[in-house]
């Protein structure tokens, strides 16, 4: 059985500012860096990781780095694990889009693409294909894949035969297990974030 460990990147600058990021390359905050370290420690203590993959965006690569460095593994980057492309909404504050483009946002919440952006089916198909290739290339191994809220959500929805709308976005630096038996995917534990609870009372320190 192949076990894929999907980790959403730590908090980014745009996450903190409540802005749409999409595929723009935005760095982690100090809190995000600490989340990556703590999640890395959790992974190293609970799994024997054989390979590391990541979206090619720096916030995902930085989240994979603590594990890769500790194990002396290379990080294999693949742009197919990127976040959904959000088109005209990239860089915009979420509150502004909700207020000024309410109709567009309502349609987006029901599964339509953002104006000029990527469709949900395009996102789902590219992430699924990349995941399938990684799983087939690593039989009976445990693989870390650092990605994004939207891309992980799309994959979990497809494997769970659900719609994106009904699957919640994973929290920053949370861990979700995807299992592969050589033919089919199945979901293991999803959205694990208990290891981050020590940070909840410390966030003000990192946001100042």
PLM regions and their residue ranges:
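Active-site signature of alpha/beta-hydrolase-fold catalytic machinery across serine-
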Residues: 66, 154-158
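Short basic (Lys/Arg) and small-residue
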Residues: 148
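Extreme N-terminal starter segment of soluble prokaryotic enzymes
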Residues: 1-5
């Amino acid at each position: 059985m192949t076990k894929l460990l999907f980790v959403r990147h730590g908090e980014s600058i745009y996450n903190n500012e409540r802005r749409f990021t999409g595929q723009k390359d935005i760095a982690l905050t100090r809190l995000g860096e600490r989340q990556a370290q703590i999640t890395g420690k959790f992974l190293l203590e609970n799994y024997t990781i054989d390979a590391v993959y990541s979206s090619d965006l720096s916030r995902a690569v930085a989240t994979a780095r603590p594990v890769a460095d500790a194990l002396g593994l290379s990080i294999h980057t693949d742009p197919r694990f990127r976040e959904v492309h959000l088109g005209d909404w990239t860089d915009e504050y979420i509150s502004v889009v909700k207020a000024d483009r309410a109709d567009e946002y309502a349609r987006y919440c029901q599964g339509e693409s953002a104006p000029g952006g990527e469709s949900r089916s395009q996102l789902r198909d590219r992430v699924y294909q990349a995941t399938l290739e990684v799983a087939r290339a690593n039989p009976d191994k445990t693989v870390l894949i650092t990605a994004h809220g939207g891309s992980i959500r799309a994959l979990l929805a497809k494997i769970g035969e659900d719609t994106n709308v009904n699957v919640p976005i994973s929290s920053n630096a949370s861990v979700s297990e995807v299992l592969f038996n050589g033919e089919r995917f199945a979901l293991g534990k999803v959205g694990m974030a208990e290891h981050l609870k020590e940070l909840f009372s410390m966030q003000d320190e990192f946001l100042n």
